[in-house]
Structures are given as structure tokens and as C-alpha cells.
């Protein structure tokens, strides 16, 4: 299979937060202390289990750590290898799974600042989606307004399944914020896992999800 034409845009690149420690510099004192004192280990979701063969190409997995956590390797394998002009980072961290609205907001901010500093500042071909905490749409709207001034953030990221259908009025503040900042809303496969992902209950196999 030949490479795509030069100038292609990869609309779904998944940089991985290597560990919760990577986000500590981007949390305020309260949440940093909470993570340390409570021994919070990780906030990864189960959307892409590390041991699942289809979560990442075997040859892209490092010997230690997660696929997608290293910019140098990602640059070589996902950008240079395909002649990619731009790539949009969709960071699928566990922000949407948290029950505490304030904690979810703090981690959404941390993830966005981490992406900007550790990825966008270091690779001019990268763009990113704004990670929001839909648990509180007003918080999510505030985060959109905060990050939209950085034009390297090109859309708002939401998961296809949240606590309720995304068309509910509850989420309208998020859509208003996206609209006033001229940003599309990108809906990615995934779930907050509050409810079964099908109308007839939980699936048996990961592929069904």
C-alpha cells in the first residue's frame, strides 16, 4: 500500500499520558496534594486496554510504557512515515469517567496544558482537541474559552456516550462555547461507562463495544 499524498491530515492521533506523575506540574496545589496523599495511581480509561492486540500496532509499542507516550517515536512512526502535514491529538484520558466535577475539571485543564507544552510546543505539525469535563457543562465551556485562544487547538473532544444523550439541553453550554469560538465538536468512540453501551445490556466482547 502506497503512502498517502504529502499534505495529508491525520485527524485522530492518540498521545498517551505516560503516568499521572506527568500531569502533576499542571495541577494546582490542592489537586496535586490530593493525588499524592491519596495515592492516586492512574486515570486511564478502558477504551483502549494496553494488553488488547487491537489497541496499538505491536511494532509501535515500546518495551516499557504505553504506545503513544513518546514524541520522538510518534514523530517517526505516525508523522514522518506517512508524509503527514498535520495531525490532531485526541488525548483519551479518564477525565470523562470521574464522578467529581471539580476533579474532572482540574484534570481536563491539566491534560490540555500538558498537551500544549509537551507535544504542540515541540512539534509544529501537531494540533489538538480540547479535552473537556462534560460532568459540568459550565466548567467545560470555561475550558473551551480558556484554550480556544491557542489556535493549535482545533476542536472540542467529546465521547459518543456520556451520562445522557449528547443532544440534551444539559450539554448546550458546551456547544455554545464551541460555536462562539469557531470550533467544531469532534465526537470520538468511547464511553463514560455509566450505563451499558447497548440498549440490551453490556456486550460480551471488547470488539462489540
Pin down the residues of each PLM region:
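Helix-coil boundary/capping segments in enzymes
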Residues: 1-209
